[in-house]
Amino acid sequence: MNKSPVVLVIRDGWGIQPGGRAMAQVNGDATLLARTPFHDEIYARYPHSTLSASGEDVGLPHGQMGNSEVGHLNLGAGRVVYQDLTRINLCIREGRLAGNAVLQETFAAAKGKRLHFLGLVSDGGVHSHWEHLVALAQVAKASGVEDILVHAITDGRDTSPTGGAGYLTQLAEGLAPTGAQIATVVGRYFAMDRDKRWERNKLAWDAIVLGRGQRAQKAAPEELRARYALGETDEFLKPLILSHPDEQRVRDGDVVFFFNFRADRTRQLSVAFLDADFAGFDREVWPRVHYVTLTEYDRTYGVPVIFLPQSLTNILGEVVSRAGLKQLRIAETEKYPHVTYFFNGGVEQQFEGEDRVIVPSPKDVATYDLKPEMSAGEVTREVTERLGQYDLVILNFANPDMVGHTGVLEAGIKAVETIDDCVRAVVEKTLSFGGRLLITADHGNCEQMLNPD
């Protein structure tokens, strides 16, 4: 006998632009420029409201934009969850960072060795913040660490595509009193892949560990501006080597400190450093390092963590499981961690009665503007075939966010139209079982794909 499910449909990155239709073309508002007959129909027929998914309403600093991780964490918890960015900022502001016992042990281990800081250098606040790196380097210097290298990952996805030169200028100024050197610069496309495209990680590994890449002739900001002039942008920046070129820079006994606070895009590079049986790409050398992370990326890593996860109880998945009900989490690869790890409070725990389905994201394109439908059709087929087996379904459609990140408006429009068709199919099937649906988003993105200037 089929169940009558409750389905939470998360249209990832489908936001509301305050300028409305009058500003739709100027802002590149794909949600309004697209043809969305089903969205328009249900918006007219059923109750609706708006949600705030940024700033203090989701546990971020005032004025900080939301993101997928934060949105899913708050949705799953059913309350405001103060984010790692907020917690870390507060710790630094209150002068408590230097007193962190794990941090003290880390920098004690780095004395007489080389300390490598690795992470995303921007103020996007989604995966990291460059000011955290400056604060950490200051504590390292005060702790007696002398040899500090920074392997900077440029953003261009959660920030301006050419903002990296400015961030590296600010970073160099902040690091000057610590003696830390920017050794490597590489785009997040290579260093932070999360879809097992190991050939991208290989390029970043070779740069960070072996010093392979274009040798810089000028300071990092000037080198980046020269790349911009050639059409290269931060996200896709190929490795730039600023110190110790063509030598093994990460050596046995060194300390490697990944300072991103968001886990999902850190794991592949982390595993390359940690796993003796790693087979994602040919490492050529495998330095045995003291690996440290700012937050917990995966409990199984068994590495020191500076900020441990918050303990969240009575979250949605737990309550449903405790009631003896069955639940399904389903998304394509790009958003699978969000409906599982993040929705479950930032832990890997899978509750009793919780099933998970991952639909592979396309691997035949470099960027999703080239395939804006992504795997939404396959996700829709999978979920409609399974709906009657579950009491609760958590469903994510990735397209509005992932295509929104590309900034290609025509593709964003196609992504929105694709999702409108897919949501129609899910709604019709759910209602045929006597079920109910809540259609929402975790944060906005494709409602503003162009900068007005």
Task: Describe the role of every protein-language-model region.
Residues 1-453:
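Feature captures the catalytic ectodomains and active-site-proximal regions of enzymes
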